Amino acid sequence: MCTHRFSVKQLAMLTAAALFVAASAASQDSSDRPPWARKPKPKSTTTGTTNSPSSTPENASPPEPVNKDNRDSNSNDEPTQQGRIRVSVNLVNVLVSVLDDNNRPAPDLPIEAFQIFEEGVKQKIEVFESETKQPLDIALMIDASLSAHKEISFEQQAAAHFIAQVLRPEDRLSVFAFDENVRQMAGFSENVKMLQTAVQRIPDGSGTSIYDALVLGSGALERRKEERRRVIIMVTDGGETTSRADFEAARKAAVRANTLLYSIIVRPVKSESGRNTAGEHAIETITDTTGGAIFFPDTAQDLDIIFDRIDRELRTQYRLGYYPNPRGPVNTYRSIQVKVLDNYKVRHRKTYLTGPQ
Protein backbone atom coordinates (compact mmCIF):
# COMPACT_ATOMS: atom_id res chain seq x y z
CA MET A 1 0.00 0.00 0.00
CA CYS A 2 2.81 2.32 0.84
CA THR A 3 4.53 1.73 -2.47
CA HIS A 4 1.31 2.41 -4.38
CA ARG A 5 0.77 5.80 -2.65
CA PHE A 6 4.36 6.83 -3.41
CA SER A 7 3.89 6.09 -7.13
CA VAL A 8 0.77 8.26 -7.34
CA LYS A 9 2.57 11.16 -5.75
CA GLN A 10 5.46 10.73 -8.11
CA LEU A 11 3.10 10.64 -11.04
CA ALA A 12 1.45 13.89 -9.92
CA MET A 13 4.83 15.60 -9.67
CA LEU A 14 5.82 14.42 -13.13
CA THR A 15 2.52 15.68 -14.56
CA ALA A 16 2.96 19.13 -13.00
CA ALA A 17 6.50 19.34 -14.36
CA ALA A 18 5.31 18.43 -17.84
CA LEU A 19 2.62 21.12 -17.76
CA PHE A 20 5.16 23.71 -16.65
CA VAL A 21 7.53 22.82 -19.51
CA ALA A 22 4.67 22.98 -22.05
CA ALA A 23 3.53 26.40 -20.81
CA SER A 24 7.08 27.74 -20.97
CA ALA A 25 7.47 26.49 -24.52
CA ALA A 26 4.19 28.06 -25.59
CA SER A 27 5.19 31.37 -24.04
CA GLN A 28 8.56 31.26 -25.78
CA ASP A 29 6.91 30.35 -29.07
CA SER A 30 4.47 33.28 -28.79
CA SER A 31 7.20 35.76 -27.95
CA ASP A 32 9.30 34.59 -30.91
CA ARG A 33 6.47 35.18 -33.36
CA PRO A 34 6.28 38.44 -35.33
CA PRO A 35 3.53 40.81 -34.15
CA TRP A 36 1.20 40.04 -37.07
CA ALA A 37 1.27 36.28 -36.22
CA ARG A 38 0.33 36.58 -32.55
CA LYS A 39 -3.19 36.09 -31.30
CA PRO A 40 -4.86 39.32 -30.17
CA LYS A 41 -5.57 40.06 -26.55
CA PRO A 42 -9.23 40.18 -25.47
CA LYS A 43 -10.92 43.48 -26.40
CA SER A 44 -11.07 46.06 -23.64
CA THR A 45 -14.49 46.99 -22.24
CA THR A 46 -13.55 50.57 -21.37
CA THR A 47 -15.42 53.38 -23.10
CA GLY A 48 -12.32 55.19 -24.30
CA THR A 49 -11.24 52.75 -27.02
CA THR A 50 -8.60 53.48 -29.62
CA ASN A 51 -8.08 52.16 -33.13
CA SER A 52 -4.77 50.41 -32.37
CA PRO A 53 -4.07 46.99 -34.00
CA SER A 54 -4.04 45.20 -30.61
CA SER A 55 -7.66 46.21 -29.90
CA THR A 56 -9.07 45.20 -33.32
CA PRO A 57 -10.32 41.57 -33.59
CA GLU A 58 -9.06 39.42 -36.46
CA ASN A 59 -11.22 39.32 -39.60
CA ALA A 60 -13.13 42.45 -38.49
CA SER A 61 -13.18 45.91 -40.05
CA PRO A 62 -11.71 48.69 -37.89
CA PRO A 63 -14.31 50.92 -36.22
CA GLU A 64 -15.34 54.15 -37.92
CA PRO A 65 -13.25 57.06 -36.61
CA VAL A 66 -15.02 59.54 -34.36
CA ASN A 67 -13.38 62.94 -34.61
CA LYS A 68 -15.77 65.29 -32.83
CA ASP A 69 -13.01 66.71 -30.74
CA ASN A 70 -10.34 66.23 -33.41
CA ARG A 71 -8.61 63.54 -31.34
CA ASP A 72 -7.34 61.50 -34.31
CA SER A 73 -4.63 63.74 -35.70
CA ASN A 74 -3.61 61.11 -38.30
CA SER A 75 -7.05 60.74 -39.88
CA ASN A 76 -5.79 62.36 -43.11
CA ASP A 77 -3.53 59.34 -43.66
CA GLU A 78 -6.26 56.71 -43.30
CA PRO A 79 -7.81 55.38 -46.53
CA THR A 80 -11.47 56.20 -47.09
CA GLN A 81 -13.82 53.24 -47.42
CA GLN A 82 -14.93 52.67 -51.01
CA GLY A 83 -18.08 54.59 -51.91
CA ARG A 84 -17.85 56.95 -48.96
CA ILE A 85 -16.22 60.33 -48.48
CA ARG A 86 -15.28 61.65 -45.05
CA VAL A 87 -15.63 65.36 -44.41
CA SER A 88 -14.72 67.48 -41.43
CA VAL A 89 -16.86 66.81 -38.37
CA ASN A 90 -15.48 69.64 -36.32
CA LEU A 91 -18.03 71.69 -34.41
CA VAL A 92 -20.09 74.00 -36.64
CA ASN A 93 -20.48 77.36 -34.89
CA VAL A 94 -23.46 79.53 -35.77
CA LEU A 95 -23.80 83.11 -34.51
CA VAL A 96 -27.45 84.11 -34.21
CA SER A 97 -28.93 87.60 -33.96
CA VAL A 98 -32.47 87.60 -32.57
CA LEU A 99 -34.44 90.83 -33.01
CA ASP A 100 -37.91 92.00 -32.03
CA ASP A 101 -40.32 93.94 -34.25
CA ASN A 102 -38.41 97.16 -33.55
CA ASN A 103 -35.07 95.60 -34.55
CA ARG A 104 -33.92 95.55 -30.95
CA PRO A 105 -31.94 92.54 -29.68
CA ALA A 106 -33.96 89.94 -27.76
CA PRO A 107 -31.73 88.78 -24.89
CA ASP A 108 -31.96 85.96 -22.32
CA LEU A 109 -33.73 83.35 -24.45
CA PRO A 110 -33.17 79.77 -23.21
CA ILE A 111 -31.72 76.97 -25.30
CA GLU A 112 -35.20 75.45 -25.54
CA ALA A 113 -36.27 78.41 -27.67
CA PHE A 114 -33.88 77.42 -30.49
CA GLN A 115 -33.88 74.72 -33.14
CA ILE A 116 -31.12 74.24 -35.69
CA PHE A 117 -31.26 72.29 -38.95
CA GLU A 118 -28.68 71.20 -41.52
CA GLU A 119 -30.00 70.30 -44.97
CA GLY A 120 -33.46 70.18 -43.38
CA VAL A 121 -32.44 67.67 -40.67
CA LYS A 122 -32.73 68.76 -37.05
CA GLN A 123 -29.41 68.80 -35.17
CA LYS A 124 -28.59 68.46 -31.49
CA ILE A 125 -27.37 71.76 -30.03
CA GLU A 126 -24.07 70.91 -28.33
CA VAL A 127 -22.97 74.48 -27.54
CA PHE A 128 -25.19 77.33 -26.43
CA GLU A 129 -24.13 80.79 -25.28
CA SER A 130 -26.42 83.72 -24.61
CA GLU A 131 -24.58 87.00 -25.26
CA THR A 132 -21.45 85.19 -26.35
CA LYS A 133 -18.21 86.50 -24.89
CA GLN A 134 -16.08 85.30 -27.79
CA PRO A 135 -13.59 88.06 -28.69
CA LEU A 136 -13.98 89.94 -31.96
CA ASP A 137 -11.66 90.20 -34.94
CA ILE A 138 -12.98 93.02 -37.13
CA ALA A 139 -11.87 94.04 -40.61
CA LEU A 140 -13.11 97.61 -41.17
CA MET A 141 -13.08 98.17 -44.94
CA ILE A 142 -13.68 101.67 -46.32
CA ASP A 143 -14.28 102.54 -49.97
CA ALA A 144 -11.74 105.17 -51.07
CA SER A 145 -12.98 105.53 -54.65
CA LEU A 146 -13.86 108.95 -56.03
CA SER A 147 -17.52 107.94 -56.40
CA ALA A 148 -17.80 107.58 -52.63
CA HIS A 149 -15.31 110.23 -51.64
CA LYS A 150 -17.63 113.16 -51.12
CA GLU A 151 -18.91 111.31 -48.02
CA ILE A 152 -15.46 110.19 -46.87
CA SER A 153 -15.09 112.72 -44.06
CA PHE A 154 -18.36 111.54 -42.50
CA GLU A 155 -17.31 107.92 -42.95
CA GLN A 156 -14.00 108.61 -41.23
CA GLN A 157 -15.64 110.38 -38.30
CA ALA A 158 -18.24 107.65 -37.82
CA ALA A 159 -15.61 104.92 -38.14
CA ALA A 160 -13.34 106.61 -35.59
CA HIS A 161 -16.25 106.82 -33.15
CA PHE A 162 -17.11 103.15 -33.76
CA ILE A 163 -13.53 102.04 -33.12
CA ALA A 164 -13.48 103.79 -29.75
CA GLN A 165 -16.87 102.37 -28.83
CA VAL A 166 -16.69 98.75 -29.97
CA LEU A 167 -13.19 97.64 -29.00
CA ARG A 168 -12.68 95.81 -25.73
CA PRO A 169 -9.26 94.74 -24.43
CA GLU A 170 -9.53 91.26 -25.96
CA ASP A 171 -10.82 92.48 -29.36
CA ARG A 172 -8.71 93.33 -32.42
CA LEU A 173 -9.50 95.52 -35.43
CA SER A 174 -7.76 96.12 -38.74
CA VAL A 175 -8.35 99.00 -41.17
CA PHE A 176 -8.47 98.43 -44.93
CA ALA A 177 -8.96 100.93 -47.76
CA PHE A 178 -10.01 99.82 -51.23
CA ASP A 179 -10.41 101.41 -54.63
CA GLU A 180 -9.00 99.58 -57.64
CA ASN A 181 -6.54 98.07 -55.14
CA VAL A 182 -6.92 96.89 -51.55
CA ARG A 183 -4.57 98.21 -48.88
CA GLN A 184 -4.30 97.29 -45.23
CA MET A 185 -3.83 100.63 -43.49
CA ALA A 186 -3.36 99.11 -40.02
CA GLY A 187 -2.91 95.53 -38.85
CA PHE A 188 -5.10 93.87 -36.23
CA SER A 189 -4.70 95.85 -33.04
CA GLU A 190 -6.51 97.06 -29.92
CA ASN A 191 -4.71 100.44 -30.11
CA VAL A 192 -7.63 102.83 -30.63
CA LYS A 193 -5.51 105.90 -31.38
CA MET A 194 -3.40 104.12 -33.98
CA LEU A 195 -6.48 102.69 -35.69
CA GLN A 196 -8.24 106.05 -35.76
CA THR A 197 -5.15 107.61 -37.32
CA ALA A 198 -5.15 104.90 -39.99
CA VAL A 199 -8.78 105.75 -40.86
CA GLN A 200 -7.88 109.43 -41.27
CA ARG A 201 -5.00 108.54 -43.63
CA ILE A 202 -7.18 106.80 -46.22
CA PRO A 203 -6.22 108.37 -49.59
CA ASP A 204 -8.33 109.26 -52.60
CA GLY A 205 -8.58 106.56 -55.25
CA SER A 206 -10.38 105.48 -58.40
CA GLY A 207 -12.29 102.31 -59.19
CA THR A 208 -14.06 100.06 -56.69
CA SER A 209 -12.88 96.50 -56.05
CA ILE A 210 -15.50 95.19 -53.64
CA TYR A 211 -15.02 91.50 -54.45
CA ASP A 212 -11.25 91.77 -54.09
CA ALA A 213 -11.72 93.49 -50.74
CA LEU A 214 -14.00 90.72 -49.49
CA VAL A 215 -11.58 88.00 -50.61
CA LEU A 216 -8.58 89.67 -48.97
CA GLY A 217 -10.45 90.68 -45.83
CA SER A 218 -11.90 87.18 -45.35
CA GLY A 219 -8.46 85.66 -45.89
CA ALA A 220 -6.89 87.95 -43.29
CA LEU A 221 -9.58 86.96 -40.77
CA GLU A 222 -9.30 83.25 -41.56
CA ARG A 223 -5.62 83.33 -40.65
CA ARG A 224 -6.51 84.59 -37.18
CA LYS A 225 -7.33 82.39 -34.17
CA GLU A 226 -10.19 79.95 -34.67
CA GLU A 227 -12.04 80.68 -31.44
CA ARG A 228 -12.68 84.35 -32.28
CA ARG A 229 -15.67 85.88 -34.06
CA ARG A 230 -14.79 87.18 -37.52
CA VAL A 231 -16.51 90.32 -38.71
CA ILE A 232 -16.19 92.49 -41.82
CA ILE A 233 -17.75 95.96 -41.75
CA MET A 234 -17.71 97.42 -45.25
CA VAL A 235 -18.56 101.04 -46.06
CA THR A 236 -18.98 101.51 -49.81
CA ASP A 237 -21.11 103.02 -52.55
CA GLY A 238 -21.79 99.51 -53.87
CA GLY A 239 -20.44 100.28 -57.35
CA GLU A 240 -18.27 97.25 -58.14
CA THR A 241 -16.06 98.11 -61.14
CA THR A 242 -12.46 96.85 -60.99
CA SER A 243 -12.21 93.55 -59.06
CA ARG A 244 -10.13 90.69 -60.38
CA ALA A 245 -12.17 88.26 -58.27
CA ASP A 246 -15.80 87.58 -59.13
CA PHE A 247 -18.98 87.30 -57.08
CA GLU A 248 -18.64 83.57 -56.37
CA ALA A 249 -15.01 83.91 -55.26
CA ALA A 250 -16.00 86.65 -52.81
CA ARG A 251 -18.96 84.68 -51.50
CA LYS A 252 -16.93 81.50 -51.12
CA ALA A 253 -14.12 83.31 -49.27
CA ALA A 254 -16.59 84.84 -46.80
CA VAL A 255 -18.35 81.51 -46.19
CA ARG A 256 -15.13 79.52 -45.81
CA ALA A 257 -13.81 81.97 -43.21
CA ASN A 258 -17.15 82.02 -41.36
CA THR A 259 -17.14 85.80 -41.71
CA LEU A 260 -20.06 87.93 -40.55
CA LEU A 261 -20.52 90.77 -43.06
CA TYR A 262 -22.13 94.10 -42.24
CA SER A 263 -22.50 96.30 -45.33
CA ILE A 264 -23.16 100.04 -45.24
CA ILE A 265 -24.10 101.32 -48.71
CA VAL A 266 -23.50 105.07 -48.95
CA ARG A 267 -25.37 105.99 -52.14
CA PRO A 268 -24.03 109.14 -53.79
CA VAL A 269 -26.95 108.98 -56.23
CA LYS A 270 -30.39 108.27 -54.77
CA SER A 271 -32.10 107.34 -58.04
CA GLU A 272 -31.66 103.69 -59.07
CA SER A 273 -31.26 104.70 -62.71
CA GLY A 274 -27.96 106.40 -61.88
CA ARG A 275 -26.51 103.69 -59.62
CA ASN A 276 -24.82 100.33 -60.00
CA THR A 277 -27.68 98.39 -58.44
CA ALA A 278 -26.21 95.07 -59.61
CA GLY A 279 -23.27 95.65 -57.27
CA GLU A 280 -25.63 96.50 -54.42
CA HIS A 281 -27.66 93.32 -54.98
CA ALA A 282 -24.48 91.22 -55.03
CA ILE A 283 -23.33 92.68 -51.72
CA GLU A 284 -26.79 92.15 -50.25
CA THR A 285 -26.71 88.46 -51.25
CA ILE A 286 -23.30 87.85 -49.68
CA THR A 287 -24.30 89.77 -46.56
CA ASP A 288 -27.44 87.67 -46.13
CA THR A 289 -25.48 84.44 -46.68
CA THR A 290 -23.11 85.26 -43.81
CA GLY A 291 -25.88 86.27 -41.39
CA GLY A 292 -24.94 89.95 -41.33
CA ALA A 293 -27.02 93.00 -42.16
CA ILE A 294 -27.07 95.67 -44.85
CA PHE A 295 -27.81 99.35 -44.25
CA PHE A 296 -28.66 102.23 -46.58
CA PRO A 297 -28.13 105.50 -44.68
CA ASP A 298 -30.16 108.43 -45.97
CA THR A 299 -27.71 110.99 -44.62
CA ALA A 300 -24.10 110.92 -43.57
CA GLN A 301 -25.22 111.53 -39.99
CA ASP A 302 -27.04 108.18 -40.05
CA LEU A 303 -23.66 106.44 -40.03
CA ASP A 304 -23.25 106.95 -36.28
CA ILE A 305 -26.65 105.35 -35.67
CA ILE A 306 -25.77 102.39 -37.88
CA PHE A 307 -22.40 101.82 -36.23
CA ASP A 308 -24.10 101.94 -32.82
CA ARG A 309 -26.61 99.34 -33.94
CA ILE A 310 -23.87 97.03 -35.21
CA ASP A 311 -22.02 97.37 -31.91
CA ARG A 312 -25.16 96.55 -29.91
CA GLU A 313 -25.92 93.53 -32.08
CA LEU A 314 -22.41 92.12 -31.78
CA ARG A 315 -22.70 92.26 -27.98
CA THR A 316 -26.02 90.44 -27.83
CA GLN A 317 -25.48 87.54 -30.22
CA TYR A 318 -26.22 83.95 -29.35
CA ARG A 319 -23.75 81.22 -30.25
CA LEU A 320 -24.99 77.76 -31.19
CA GLY A 321 -22.83 74.78 -32.07
CA TYR A 322 -23.51 71.29 -33.41
CA TYR A 323 -21.62 68.34 -34.89
CA PRO A 324 -22.66 67.64 -38.49
CA ASN A 325 -23.06 64.36 -40.35
CA PRO A 326 -19.48 63.35 -41.26
CA ARG A 327 -20.47 61.77 -44.60
CA GLY A 328 -20.78 63.57 -47.90
CA PRO A 329 -18.77 65.22 -50.68
CA VAL A 330 -16.05 67.67 -49.74
CA ASN A 331 -15.87 71.36 -50.62
CA THR A 332 -19.64 71.70 -50.98
CA TYR A 333 -22.17 74.00 -49.37
CA ARG A 334 -24.45 72.69 -46.63
CA SER A 335 -27.49 74.73 -45.68
CA ILE A 336 -28.17 75.90 -42.12
CA GLN A 337 -31.49 77.04 -40.70
CA VAL A 338 -32.19 78.33 -37.20
CA LYS A 339 -35.71 78.64 -35.84
CA VAL A 340 -36.69 80.55 -32.71
CA LEU A 341 -39.97 80.31 -30.84
CA ASP A 342 -42.37 83.24 -30.99
CA ASN A 343 -42.25 85.79 -33.79
CA TYR A 344 -38.69 87.03 -33.48
CA LYS A 345 -36.61 87.93 -36.52
CA VAL A 346 -33.53 85.75 -36.82
CA ARG A 347 -30.28 86.29 -38.73
CA HIS A 348 -27.54 83.69 -39.02
CA ARG A 349 -25.20 82.28 -41.62
CA LYS A 350 -27.14 80.27 -44.17
CA THR A 351 -24.46 77.81 -45.19
CA TYR A 352 -20.96 76.50 -44.62
CA LEU A 353 -18.38 74.70 -46.73
CA THR A 354 -17.42 71.12 -45.97
CA GLY A 355 -13.73 70.35 -45.86
CA PRO A 356 -11.65 67.16 -46.18
CA GLN A 357 -10.95 65.28 -42.96
PLM feature segments, named:
Residues 12-22:
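Bacterial N-terminal signal peptides
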Residues 5, 21-25:
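Extracytoplasmic/periplasmic terminal helices and flexible tails
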Residues 27-357:
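Scaffold/interface architecture of coatomer-like assemblies
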Residues 2-14:
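Bacterial N-terminal signal peptides that target proteins for export
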